[in-house]
Regions:
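Short glycine/proline- and aromatic-enriched beta-strand/turn motifs that initiate or cap beta-hairpins
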Residues: 20-59, 63-78, 113, 134, ...
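Short, charged, low-hydrophobicity "junction" segments
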Residues: 37-47, 148-151, 193-194, 303-307
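Outer-membrane pore/translocation modules
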Residues: 87-208, 217, 224-236, 243, ...
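A cross-kingdom feature marking solvent-exposed beta-strand/loop segments within repeated
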Residues: 79-88
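Outer membrane beta-barrel transmembrane domains
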Residues: 180-183, 187-363
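Cleavable N-terminal export/targeting peptides
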Residues: 1-25, 362-363
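Short loop/turn motifs that connect adjacent beta-strands in outer-membrane beta-barrel proteins
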Residues: 20-27, 57-67, 103-112, 149, ...
Length: 363
């Protein structure tokens, strides 16, 4: 999902010097995931995605770190209705992101520079278009929300300072993207898409609480006008609020995370408003120590409101198990989702299943 929910929290950093690091402290992370939803009438679709993201963190020294990430993804939309619609699939490598982080003054100031290398599938055929479109839905929150875009570059700075027992952080960034051809039209033409610039500002606070922490953050993203084939439109600005809390309680670890994404109304090329939307999410997890690891059942609730449509809602019951062994951190997880999905023709019952295996090797 493109929320970048962690962005607000990334502004806060502990105001303590980093331990000495080198390339020998490189760590590798992978997280194969499968997510599927079955949406009943009037939508009548099963939407599935399998992804294998890989992320490598390479610390050069205590102040300079590089990270590289990419993924393989395969998405599928299968119509379940009585019609003759064809199944839509799209798969392949996604874009590759390379980022450098340079810190100053005991990590009080962090300068970030990143590039998006278009190694993914940036152009969807007519047969692939439905699958490419469906995985971009913010409410359904697929792990990979697009298969590829053009070249892009991002630069940013974040500053964190202790204020008494609190840590306060703020930052900003700018992203510029090159044009690309996102799809093949039914006429065979390939419209050129030029994304507008993205400007982002972030602010966050965190504070120790018992054995854990309490953190809040706010991210504002402003988007310039997009141009596709000479038609100008705007997707609307986004506001992301986030709060998180974790602490020990009676031998268990309690985790509460909440976020809210508000997108202001955009505008299509005719001058018509697209309408605002809001997605709210809360997750409660309780971790129990046992069997050489931590077992964590969780409950997650999400609500999506749009103009001129009923609210969409879903709930997910999940379970994960975390264990560290021989330099590896392994976390398998699974969850079942149920709810309703608002569509033009009425509400559709929704159910789904997800499974993931997160693996980290290295320090």
């Amino acid at each position: 999902m493109r929320f970048l929910i962690a962005a607000a929290a990334s502004c806060t950093a502990l105001a303590t010097p980093l331990a000495a690091q080198s390339v020998f402290d490189t760590n590798v992370r992978a997280a194969p995931q499968f997510l599927t939803y079955q949406i009943k009438a009037p939508v009548n679709e099963t939407i599935s995605e399998f992804t294998t993201p890989i992320f490598v963190v390479i610390p050069i020294n205590s102040t300079l770190t590089f990270d590289v990430g990419t993924a393989f993804a395969s998405a599928r939309v299968k119509p379940n209705g009585p019609g003759t619609e064809q199944t839509s699939t799209i798969s392949g490598l996604t874009d590759t992101q390379i980022r450098a982080n340079l810190s100053f003054g005991s990590d009080f100031v962090v300068v970030t520079a990143g590039v998006n290398i278009p190694t993914g599938k940036e152009t969807a055929t007519q047969e692939e278009l439905l699958a490419a479109f469906r995985i971009g839905n913010d409410f359904l929150a697929f792990p990979i929300s697009n298969m590829g875009t053009g070249f892009g570059a991002t630069g940013g700075i974040a500053i964190a300072r202790p204020i008494g027992s609190w840590n306060f952080g703020f930052g900003g960034s700018l992203r510029q993207s090159a044009s690309y051809e996102p799809f093949v039209a039914n006429t065979g033409t390939r419209p050129r898409f030029q994304p507008g610039n993205e400007y982002r500002a972030r602010v966050g606070l965190d504070h120790p609480f018992g054995t854990g922490r309490f953190a809040v953050g706010l991210t504002y993203s402003k988007f310039g006008n997009d141009d596709i084939g000479g038609s100008i439109y705007n997707t609307g600005d986004r506001y992301i609020a986030q709060a998180g809390f974790n602490n020990s309680l009676g031998g268990a670890n309690v985790l509460v995370n909440a976020w809210n994404l508000y997108r202001s109304s955009g505008m299509i090329f005719t001058g018509e408003r697209t309408g605002a939307e809001n997605i709210a999410n809360i997750l409660l997890g309780i971790g129990f120590h046992g069997m050489s690891g931590v077992i964590e059942p969780s409950v997650e609730l999400r609500n999506w409101t749009q103009e001129q449509l009923p609210a969409s809602m879903l709930g997910t019951i999940g379970l994960r198990y975390s264990v560290d062994a021989a330099g590896f951190a392994i976390t398998p997880s699974a969850g079942y989702t149920f709810g309703r999905f608002a569509a033009v023709g009425g509400n559709a019952d929704l159910s789904g299943f997800r499974a993931a295996l997160a693996i980290r090797f290295g320090s």
